[in-house]
Amino acid sequence: ASVTVGYSDAVTGARQIKLLGLSGIYTQMLDENRPSMRGLAAPFGLSYVPGQWLESIQVSKGLSSVNNGAESITGQINMEYRKPTDEKPLFLNASVMNDTKTDFNIASSLQMGEKWSTVLLGHVSGNFRTFDHNHDGFMDDPEMFQVNVANRWLYYGPTGVQVRFGLRALQDMRKGGQSGYDHKKYTLSSTSPWGSDIVNRQLNTYVKVGVPISADNAKNIAFVADYTLTDMNLRAGASKYL
């Protein structure tokens, strides 16, 4: 297959996409045509997009348009979320996998009159038990707990003016390495289990405004603004980073 997803780091659980054989830094990730998963958000970006939140995914292989940035070398992957105008007013999903990963999702679309609509999205997931199937002393997948919430709004005016804006907040905690690792007790001279602790907090907000400039709405002018704040704290062994 030309699109694959793999672990780049089994200790932290970071994942990356390979498109046409090249790693994820050459693939542009888009959130409804807005560039996403940049900088500190890149290693765990895929983990912060619950599958049940998505309506569709579009994959464009090869050199793509530079309208949304110039980092697309092997292609673009655009994710379309559930819309405020979704016909399903309430969606609930829960799953427990055989590796004890638990996953809960909710999506609720609300119509606030003829012009306004909104969608509320919620996600809670976690790995609550360690496992080491290959018996190498290291956890095959890190313990993790994630809370992810989002609220998206749509205004559609009678003249064709559209305003879309939203807010998303998440907290992700991961503990990898050897089972029993505690950064408060670990020292370089000790024989205590080695591991890593990661706490990642992220806040994202955006606004998109489209104004038609022709009678048939075939032409329009748009304004897009996006802001992401990422706060990551990492402890690996006795060292603290970021």
Residue ranges and their predicted role:
Residues T4, Y26, S36-M37, L63-N67, ...:
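Short beta-strands and strand-coil junctions in structured, solvent-facing domains, enriched
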Residues N127-N148, L154-I221, Y227-L242:
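Flexible loop and strand-edge segments within Gram-negative outer membrane beta-barrel domains
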Residues R34-K61, V149:
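Short acidic/polar hinge/loop motifs at secondary-structure boundaries
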Residues A1, R15-K18, L30, F44-P50, ...:
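N-terminal periplasmic accessory domains that precede
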Residues N68, P84-P89, G113-K115, P158-Q162, ...:
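Short loop/turn motifs that connect adjacent beta-strands in outer-membrane beta-barrel proteins
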Residues A1-P35:
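Extracytoplasmic beta-strand/coil segments of soluble accessory domains associated
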Residues Q28, S56-S60, Q76-R82, P89-N98, ...:
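Predominantly transmembrane beta-strands of Gram-negative outer membrane beta-barrel pores used
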Residues A14, F44, L54, S72-T74, ...:
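Transmembrane beta-barrel architecture of outer-membrane proteins
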